[in-house]
């Protein structure tokens, strides 16, 4: 961390950076600065624009407008190769190493001949205190050391600007401390680090400055020592939204009737000491007619839990009970037939067939139930019903899903899940990457679904979304749920965030 206020010219200045996707403004005139020898932490909720900004700086994505000043020169657009030449290196959350190659081969992979210096590599290893056996396979490294290999790859390219995307998401506290020791050694050489994270205690430990992004803008920026936790929490939290569907929309939304009806409050889904990839000993009950919020940080195990419930991942221990019957051994299709429906986090790669028609997508799960072949007239009528209920904007049923905006794609995905007649609907980040108007529509929709006594499990990293929508809330921390469900006044952004971040003051928030 910086120990002096005397700094040279900034390593990086991003000025008035704008970016739009499918008509949605993702970045709205961003200014961002990084100095030599400092860690500038970047926080924000999902969809705030952090990753987009960093991809622009790293040359992966072009900005629509704005400039990047690097080394005294202004650039409108970079490529990844050009960014590397300018000393910029992005270390992704999941290190992209070749496990079957040696550590040495991974570090030197892709370097220009003039950079292929074994002596330079050895000097960097010594400076950072790395005790690698360079001839060992990269696949034998733990996560923290894989992160360091990625960082070394950047330094071998003479990188002066390192962008670390959630570098501690998969690390234990001991691994995190080891990484921080090496980062501090690196800062002493004049390298600047952009540190993207959701973990406030770690940010306070390592960062000189903090910037908070919200809805494509910088909502807060300042020295770490001058910003309180409450300041940061308030900056992350978006504005409140409205709450209910119109009467006519509710009529159009009425779900298909071929599912068992449960009285509100009836336990529908029960998890007993569930253990799987990324989570352990998770127990909870989901009731008919409620929205149960599941909050937590990136890497807390929420998506892994959801995919295990749906049968996409292997269950290692515990029991899943649906309507009082164990479903551990059932396939995904069998769980779907029994009314367990999952809306995945990534609508484009996991949720929709982007090249298929809208009508086909909406009825895709019911095609699986009655045979693959579509019934065009019936499918078009089904799509029309959801268009009216969800205010989906499109030109014709035959158009491909990829032609819609992100918000309308998400509504098509929700319609697809609803047409499968869910008893339990698991929605993972349902408003990620959609604008405020579409978010409001989705919030209204989820309430109306719950009003039909569907049990809704809402997984979201948007804590205000959880506060606004959930009847009860569990917070996952490092793969576990170590508290009883939050209810009533305890469901607030401050309490949820303190539990999720592992903040030492979290108990005070519940008083």
Curated annotation (Swiss-Prot):
**Localization of this protein:** Cell inner membrane
| Gene Ontology molecular function: any one | ATP hydrolysis activity
In its keyword annotation, does this UniProt entry include Ion transport?
no
Reaction catalyzed: ATP + H2O + (2R,4S)-2-methyl-2,3,3,4-tetrahydroxytetrahydrofuran-[AI-2-binding protein]Side 1 = ADP + phosphate + (2R,4S)-2-methyl-2,3,3,4-tetrahydroxytetrahydrofuranSide 2 + [AI-2-binding protein]Side 1
Q: What class of enzyme is it?
A: translocase
ABC transporter domain: residues covered: 12-240, 240-503
Main localization, broad class: membrane
Q: Which UniProt keywords apply?
A: ATP-binding, Cell inner membrane, Cell membrane, Membrane, Nucleotide-binding, Repeat, Translocase, Transport
* Superkingdom: Bacteria
A GO CC term attached to the entry:
plasma membrane
Cite the binding residues for ATP.
44-51
Q: Any idea of its EC number?
A: 7.6.2.13
- What CDD domains does this protein's entry cite? ABC_Carb_Monos_I, ABC_Carb_Monos_II
Q: How does it sit in the membrane?
A: Peripheral membrane protein
Classification via Pfam families: ABC_tran
Instruction: Tell me which InterPro entries the record gives.
Output: AAA+_ATPase, ABC_carbohydrate_import_ATPase, ABC_transporter-like_ATP-bd, ABC_transporter-like_CS, P-loop_NTPase
This protein's record includes keyword Protein transport: no
Give the similarity note: Belongs to the ABC transporter superfamily. AI-2 autoinducer porter (TC 3.A.1.2.8) family.
Its quaternary organisation is:
The complex is composed of two ATP-binding proteins (LsrA), two transmembrane proteins (LsrC and LsrD) and a solute-binding protein (LsrB).
Instruction: Enumerate the NCBIfam families for this protein.
Output: PRK15439.1 (NF011967)
What is the role of this chain? Part of the ABC transporter complex LsrABCD involved in autoinducer 2 (AI-2) import. Responsible for energy coupling to the transport system.
Q: What is this protein called?
A: Autoinducer 2 import ATP-binding protein LsrA
Q: Which organism is it from?
A: Escherichia coli (strain SMS-3-5 / SECEC)
Gene name as annotated? lsrA
């Amino acid at each position: 961390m910086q120990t002096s206020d005397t700094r040279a010219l900034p390593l990086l200045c991003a000025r008035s950076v704008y970016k739009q996707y499918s008509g949605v403004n993702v970045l709205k005139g961003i200014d961002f600065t990084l100095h030599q020898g400092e860690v500038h932490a970047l926080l924000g909720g999902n969809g705030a624009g952090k990753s987009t900004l960093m991809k622009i700086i790293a040359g992966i994505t072009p900005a629509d407008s704005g400039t990047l000043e690097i080394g005294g020169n202004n650039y409108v657009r970079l490529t990844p190769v050009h960014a590397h030449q300018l000393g910029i290196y992005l270390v992704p959350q999941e290190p992209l190493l070749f496990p079957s190659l040696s550590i040495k081969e991974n570090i030197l992979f892709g370097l220009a001949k003039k950079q292929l210096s074994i002596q330079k590599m050895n000097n960097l290893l010594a400076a950072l205190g790395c005790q690698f056996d360079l001839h060992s396979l990269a696949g034998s490294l733990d996560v923290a050391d894989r992160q360091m290999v990625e960082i070394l790859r950047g330094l071998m390219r003479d990188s002066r600007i390192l962008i670390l995307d959630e570098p501690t998401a998969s690390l234990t506290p001991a691994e995190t401390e080891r990484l921080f020791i090496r980062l501090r050694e690196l800062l002493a050489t004049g390298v600047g680090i952009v540190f993207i994270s959701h973990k406030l205690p770690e940010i306070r430990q390592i960062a000189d400055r903090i910037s908070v992004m919200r809805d494509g803008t910088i909502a807060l920026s300042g020295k770490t020592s001058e910003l309180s936790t409450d300041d940061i929490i308030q900056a992350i939290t978006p504005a409140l939204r409205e709450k209910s569907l119109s009467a006519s929309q509710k009529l159009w939304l009425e779900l298909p009737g071929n599912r068992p009806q449960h009285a509100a409050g009836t336990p529908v889904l029960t998890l007993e000491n569930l253990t799987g990839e990324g989570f352990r000993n998770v127990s909870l009950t989901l009731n008919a007619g409620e929205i149960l919020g599941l909050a937590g940080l990136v890497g807390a195990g929420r998506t892994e839990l959801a995919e295990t419930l749906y049968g996409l991942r292997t269950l290692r221990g515990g029991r899943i009970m649906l309507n009082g019957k164990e479903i551990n051994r059932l396939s995904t299709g069998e769980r779907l037939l029994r009314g367990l429906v999952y809306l995945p986090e990534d609508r484009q790669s996991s949720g929709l067939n982007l090249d298929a028609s809208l009508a086909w997508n909406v009825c895709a799960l019911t095609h699986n139930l009655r045979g693959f072949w579509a019934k065009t007239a019936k499918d078009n009528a089904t799509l029309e019903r959801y268009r009216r209920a969800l205010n989906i904007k499109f030109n014709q049923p035959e158009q491909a899903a990829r032609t819609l905006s992100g918000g309308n794609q998400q509504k098509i995905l929700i319609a697809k899940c609803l047409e499968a007649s869910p008893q339990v609907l698991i929605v993972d980040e349902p408003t990620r990457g959609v604008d405020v108007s579409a978010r409001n529509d989705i919030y209204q929709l989820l309430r109306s679904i719950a009003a039909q006594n569907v049990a809704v499990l809402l997984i979201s990293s948007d804590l205000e979304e959880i506060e606004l929508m959930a009847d009860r809330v569990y917070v996952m921390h490092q793969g576990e749920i170590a508290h009883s469900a939050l209810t009533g006044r305890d469901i607030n952004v401050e309490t949820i965030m303190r539990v999720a971040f592992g903040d030492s003051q979290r108990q005070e928030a519940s008083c």
